[in-house]
Regions:
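Asp-based, Mg2+/Mn2+-dependent phosphohydrolase catalytic module
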Residues: 1-23, 129-234
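Active-site neighborhood of HAD-like aspartate-dependent phosphohydrolases
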Residues: 2-61
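Short, acidic loop-to-helix structural element flanking the phosphoryl-transfer center
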Residues: 15-16, 21, 96-123, 129-133
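Conserved SAM-binding loop
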Residues: 33, 104, 121-124, 156, ...
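Helix-loop "lid/cap" segments that line or gate small-molecule binding pockets
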Residues: 45-48, 67-81, 135, 168
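Anion (oxyanion) recognition and catalysis
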Residues: 49, 115-116, 192
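Helix N-cap/coil-helix junction residues
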Residues: 53-55, 81, 141, 172-173
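Metal-dependent phosphoesterase signature
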Residues: 54, 73-110
Length: 234
């Protein structure tokens, strides 16, 4: 068992590799598939610094993985600007920084393709739909997902369970039979609240998502072996 906080009930992921396999899989995007979360965090710090402002570590940690509108509101308050103005400035710079080629994080392409060949697969992200679709296209992985659920598709974003519940419904699977994979505390809270099994793959320093199984990256060889053993259910 990985050194994680105890969950409400024993998880099949406490054994590695598990003797269990999911009916469907739901992946986060930013910070899990690609290092966009780190770029977004760096932009926020640059923006605050240019305005002579900052966030304390607790506030910074709590904002990681939250929807753009929540982050913008917090930064606008910190710098003393109208949220609409701050949001326009931040998003314009974010689009400029994201204009270059996207590099998937280690193990992402092989893992996504292996899952997609065997089980229904969704992505669930706090990003707006246009940014999410652009990221998946940029990674060359858009065709691997049966559905993509964005911030625009639900009433409440992560850490509420809505995104994960919507993804499970779209895939025709019960949440308890789904595997979620997340990198942030915010996303982990959402997946667990939805009742899914969860693997955490944190990529941002300071993030300690609670999950029954934690991996250093999606390039984990035991993960690859486990997925390769799933029978095809598509």
């Amino acid at each position: 068992m990985s050194p994680q906080s105890e969950t409400a009930a024993p998880s099949p992921l406490e054994t590695w590799p598990p003797q269990w396999s999911p009916s469907a899989v739901v992946l986060d995007c930013d910070g899990l598939l690609v290092d966009t979360e780190a770029r977004w965090l760096a932009l926020q710090e640059d923006y605050l610094s240019r305005h002579g402002a900052g966030l304390d570590p607790v506030a910074r940690r709590a904002l990681t993985g939250r929807p753009i509108e929540v982050v913008v509101a917090a930064l606008a308050e910190a710098v003393g600007k109208d949220p609409h103005l701050a949001g326009a400035e931040l998003l314009a710079e974010h689009e400029e920084r994201m204009g270059g080629p996207l590099e998937p994080l280690p193990g992402v392409v092989d893992t996504v393709r292996a899952i997609a060949a065997r089980r229904p697969l969704a992505v669930a992200s706090n990003s707006p739909r246009d940014l999410l679709e652009g990221t998946l296209e940029g990674l060359g992985l858009a065709d691997a997902f049966d559905t993509a659920i964005s911030f625009d598709d639900v009433v409440a974003a992560k850490p509420a369970p809505d995104l994960y519940l919507a993804a499970a419904a779209a895939l025709g699977a019960a949440p308890a039979d789904c595997l979620a994979v997340e990198d942030s505390e915010t996303g982990a809270q959402a997946a667990l609240a939805a009742g899914m099994q969860l693997i955490a793959v944190p990529s941002i320093p300071g993030q300690e998502p609670v999950a029954p199984r934690r991996l250093d990256s999606l390039a984990d060889p035991v993960l690859a072996e486990w997925i390769a053993g799933w029978e095809v259910r598509r």
